[in-house]
């Protein structure tokens, strides 16, 4: 018998009242925990709540409220300890409360909101898309079950808007972003001007509008985003703990407008806002590094326009401050180090001192070494470091780093990035492969150079063309293994939210490292599966040569370090150094076609050449190379039959598809042809006689 049950017996308290006493005891312990932070108090709250529920009659009208309270207590302990079982139990008991509450009940929306928040918390922990989907459904139910005059409506609307915005970040579905913006606007409309959450809701809307601007490029969205962020700042008292975050957000939006319009006044105001954000952040605050980092970025923007050394020097100083105030295990440390490395690169460009270039390389290498960071930040830092190592002629270190980057690339995905960042990542991947190829060619490692280049290009294509990727092929053959690989990639790339409680954040960091190790093992397992030995590795040189049925493939690789042509035929592999073709003399690229044509040795007729441009040569028109004056034959048109392919692996894919299509036609044993008459043309005069001529053609 519990103390309360004994007390009830001694004092003639009804047994029906005992659950109420346990509930009061639980609430008291919870309130005491909120004051003291004592783990014993939150555990006492949970134990008391459970005892009261166990003693309650199933028809007790207070049971659903007690279940809901228990869910809140369990989630609170989860935030303290990170114990997943507490979060799972919280979801279970609040779901039970919701299912026991009839539609139209005044407490239903609040319970739905709690359940949605807990499911969202599980999504943040695991990255499981099904949890985000369910959280959105629950939040939508909460809104739909709330009358317009209910004081909680604005909160439920805000929650739904944030969840929809989160799904947009994962899927890039514009319908989600549009609904998120509409919902956030409704939340603000129902929020009084003196409400303590108004600024946070305005800040959310500003971020959503900023996302739509990044996607669509509509200036009105950026203008609305700035005005909304400005309202958030103006609605916040000077000593409010979130003021620095709102100021930083406003500064970012103003910086975006400055980049678009080139208006210096916007950049000046952005710097002022970022500086105020730094000043509003107390020493020791976890956000201190982020605020310093943002200020450094804006100072560099002004330096790039004015070349005032004081801005560059202050940017380096604030960037270093961000790094120094960030613990080694922090997931954003790589981003801060990356920025400081780039600031020192700017200093080297100004001073020409190798010491400054060495500092830049050192910071970038540190960023690469941050194992707790998402792969995106590590790869971008290492790719820039490769460029700087080339300037310093540190070839061996460049090869070592480049190989490690290529090994990490299968762990990076771009789905959670905005379009500008996606394009940046793809170009970064290509740059890594091109630079590594150049380093290897400088040490006469031709086979390895070509295979590394193809590996990088294969990974790029897997990001751009999912239906032709190694992963799509694996899904077809081994769905469960492919899903495990994709799940681990998602987990390794999942960003850590700044609002995540400290203990949970530490567990997420630990889990990210575990997931990275599991991903390495998963890759090894995949490459042991017959037919998938080269998963995310590109082809071997032998495989490349097997797909060349006629002519040659010519790869032109132009980097700041060196330029080369690699010529691959079905029985040979050779390279031609192109000393006259450098990054600074790219206008001389027609030399490439001339040299390559003279080395292809056609047995008869014009040689067939498949062109692949790499590095700075990726957009060059090799088929149009040469002299085109009247009567001249010194050009690619007269010497070659030119085609293009993004990679040799893609050429093999296209050949296999064509072969399969031909086999299907042969199996049908019919000759078919599609003939279309065009009596009208969208951009031409058309031919009214075309339909009459069709029977004769047939």
Regions found by a protein language model. Name each.
Residues 4, 26-29, 49, 71-74, ...:
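Non-transmembrane amphipathic alpha-helical segments
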């Amino acid at each position: 018998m519990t103390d309360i049950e004994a007390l009830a017996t001694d004092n003639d308290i009804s047994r029906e009242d005992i659950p109420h006493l346990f509930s009061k005891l639980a609430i008291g312990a919870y309130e005491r925990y909120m004051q003291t932070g004592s783990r014993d108090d939150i555990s006492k709250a949970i134990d008391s709540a459970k005892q009261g529920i166990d003693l309650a009659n199933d028809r007790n009208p207070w049971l659903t409220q007690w279940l809901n309270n228990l869910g809140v207590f369990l989630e609170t302990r989860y935030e303290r300890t990170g114990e997943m079982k507490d979060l799972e139990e919280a979801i279970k008991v609040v779901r039970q409360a919701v299912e026991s509450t009839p539609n139209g009940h005044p407490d239903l929306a609040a319970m739905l909101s709690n359940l949605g928040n807990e499911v969202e918390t599980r999504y943040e922990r695991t990255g499981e898309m099904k949890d985000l989907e369910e959280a959105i459904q629950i939040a939508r139910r909460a809104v739909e079950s709330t009358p317009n005059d209910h004081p909680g409506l604005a909160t439920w609307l805000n929650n739904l808007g944030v969840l929809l915005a989160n799904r947009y970040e994962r899927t890039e579905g514009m319908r989600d972003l549009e609904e998120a913006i509409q919902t956030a606007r409704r939340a603000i409309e129902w929020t009084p001007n003196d409400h303590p959450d108004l600024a946070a809701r305005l800040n959310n809307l500003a971020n959503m509008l900023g996302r739509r601007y990044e996607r669509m490029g509509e200036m009105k969205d950026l203008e609305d985003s700035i005005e909304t962020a400005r309202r958030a700042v103006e609605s916040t008292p000077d000593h409010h703990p979130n003021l620095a975050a709102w100021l930083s957000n406003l500064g970012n939006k103003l910086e975006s407008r400055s980049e678009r319009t080139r208006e210096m006044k916007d950049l000046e105001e952005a710097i002022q806002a970022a500086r105020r954000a730094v000043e509003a952040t107390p020493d020791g605050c976890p956000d201190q590094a982020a605020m310093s980092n943002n200020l450094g970025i804006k100072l560099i923007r002004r330096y790039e326009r004015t070349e005032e050394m004081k801005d560059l020097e202050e940017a380096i100083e604030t960037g270093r401050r961000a790094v120094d105030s960030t613990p080694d295990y922090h997931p954003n440390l790589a981003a801060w180090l990356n920025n400081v490395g780039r600031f020192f690169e700017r200093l080297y460009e100004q001073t020409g001192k190798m010491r400054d270039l060495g500092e830049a390389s050192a910071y970038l290498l540190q960023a690469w070494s941050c194992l707790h960071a998402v792969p995106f930040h590590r790869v971008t830092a290492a790719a820039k470091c490769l460029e700087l190592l080339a300037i310093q002629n540190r070839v061996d270190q460049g090869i070592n780093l480049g190989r490690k980057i290529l090994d990490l690339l299968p762990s990076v995905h771009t789905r959670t990035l905005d379009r500008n960042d996606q394009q940046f990542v793809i170009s970064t991947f290509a740059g890594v492969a091109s630079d590594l190829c150049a380093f290897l060619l400088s040490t006469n490692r031709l086979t390895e150079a070509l295979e590394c280049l193809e590996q990088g290009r294969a990974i790029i294509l897997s990001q751009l063309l999912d239906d032709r990727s190694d992963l799509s092929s694996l899904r077809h053959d081994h769905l469960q293994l492919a899903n495990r690989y994709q799940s681990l990639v998602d987990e390794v790339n999942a960003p850590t939210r700044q609002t995540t409680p400290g203990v949970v954040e530490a567990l997420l960091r630990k889990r990210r490292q575990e997931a990275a190790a599991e991903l390495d093992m998963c890759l090894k397992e995949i490459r042991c599966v017959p037919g998938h030995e080269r998963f995310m590795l590109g082809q071997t040189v032998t495989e490349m040569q097997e797909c060349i049925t006629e002519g040659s493939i010519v790869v032109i690789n132009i980097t700041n370090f060196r330029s080369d042509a690699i010529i691959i035929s079905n029985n040979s592999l050779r390279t031609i150094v192109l000393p006259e073709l450098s990054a600074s003399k790219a206008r001389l690229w027609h030399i490439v076609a001339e040299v390559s044509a003279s080395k292809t040795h056609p047995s008869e007729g014009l040689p067939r050449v498949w062109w692949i441009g790499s590095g700075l040569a990726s957009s060059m028109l090799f088929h149009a190379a040469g002299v085109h004056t009247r009567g001249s034959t010194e050009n690619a048109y007269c010497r070659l039959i030119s085609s293009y392919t993004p990679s040799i692996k893609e050429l093999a894919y296209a050949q296999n598809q064509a072969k399969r299509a031909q086999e299907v036609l042969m199996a049908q044993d019919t000759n078919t042809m599609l003939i279309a008459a065009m009596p009208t043309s969208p951009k031409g005069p058309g031919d009214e006689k075309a339909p009459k001529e069709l029977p004769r053609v047939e």
